[in-house]
Amino acid sequence: MRRGLGVCYYPEQWPKSRWKDDVLNMKNLGISFVRIAEFSWAMIEPKPKEYNFNLIDEIIDIIGKNDLKVVLGTPTAAPPSWMIELYPDMLPINQSGLARQFGSRRHYCFSHEKFVEHCEALVRVMAKHFGENPYLAAWQIDNEYGCHDTTISYSSLALAGYRKWLKKRFSN
């Protein structure tokens, strides 16, 4: 794999009319890699099992046609609001017993089976859709794991998951 300088880019935060100029500026500055999509789950899957990759396809095409490569993030760090509406028990619980609220990233309990199922489904669909794209240089699996004190949950789901893991790990 070639080496080079990379940037993070969030095309969903900018008007499409700006994308080509932004990518051209990246190219002129010597950028080689552009990381995208790590927080775009709500855009990619606005409703359960309804996937729309149009914006991601479009920006990947612009990036690639300007001789830059894409690092594609799996957006599992930021589940969409519909998921919290379907599974309100998915919110992690802090040490004081309060639920982390929707609106940032990592607003889920890692032990929630439905969260894991939705992550797996999303990543499989993304792999099928983007897997052969010649402009992709790499995949970024998840994003900022452990940031902002978000990996620990004191929820009953986390406790049950931990006990299940212990039983698998230790037979006695």
What are the roles of these predicted feature ranges?
Residues 1-5, 30-32, 64-70, 132-137:
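Short, well-ordered coil/turn segments that N-cap beta-strands
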Residues 1-18, 24-32:
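An acidic-aromatic substrate-binding cleft motif
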Residues 14, 19, 41, 139, ...:
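Tryptophan-centered motif/residue detector
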Residues 20-100, 124-127:
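Aromatic-lined substrate-binding rim segments of carbohydrate-active enzymes
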Residues 65-67, 79-172:
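Active-site region of glycoside hydrolase catalytic domains
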